[in-house]
Amino acid sequence: MGQKVHPRGFRLGLSADWQAKWFNEKNYKEWLLEDEEIRKFIKNRYYHAGISEIYVERPDAERINITVKTARPGIIIGRKGAEITSLREELERKFNRRVVINIEEIKTPELDAQLVAESIASRIEKRASYKVAMKRAIMNAMRKGAQGIKVMVAGRLGGAEIARREWYLRGRLPLQKLKAIIDYGTATAWTKYGTIGIKVWIYKGDADI
């Protein structure tokens, strides 16, 4: 039986980048837990901001550089930068280090796999048809220039007694091609019948490597 490889981990250093850019043998465990806490804190605080990825860089032991990729930068920045200043000060108090926050706007959220997965999850939680939500996401991605997209949902679909999985594929999805730029995202929809898992793969073309 074939084993699945994470699309991002398979391409690290080629067409994908690391979400954490630091190494410290002595404090590795502490810093790793801090990274996860930072990501969870920002995601929970700005869950309506369309946050896709949060990168953490540590130039030294006293500084943390955070880059947030979001579809709605205005929510995080706030009026005249008040919100981002408040966030920075709170993180500095929490972790006792100097924090620098950079915001990167996602120009085309329809081509961001994480945002697409979260959008489908949100529609399912609002009792929309999972088939309609999947097909709409695929149509929007292809219209915006995706070369291929696959969406898979698993769970008690439509309130069925037995859990199952369904998927739709449009275009090409060369998962074994190292230079293929494949974005991957996951999300969970919480329904009264239980959880429904969503996975999204988007093929955006090939990297020059």
UniProtKB/Swiss-Prot annotation:
Domain of life: Bacteria
GO molecular function: mRNA binding; rRNA binding; structural constituent of ribosome
PROSITE patterns, sorted: KH_TYPE_2, RIBOSOMAL_S3
Keyword set, alphabetical order: Ribonucleoprotein, Ribosomal protein, RNA-binding, rRNA-binding
Oligomer status and interactors: Part of the 30S ribosomal subunit. Forms a tight complex with proteins S10 and S14.
Role: Binds the lower part of the 30S subunit head. Binds mRNA in the 70S ribosome, positioning it for translation.
Protein name in the entry: Small ribosomal subunit protein uS3
Organism: Thermotoga petrophila (strain ATCC BAA-488 / DSM 13995 / JCM 10881 / RKU-1)
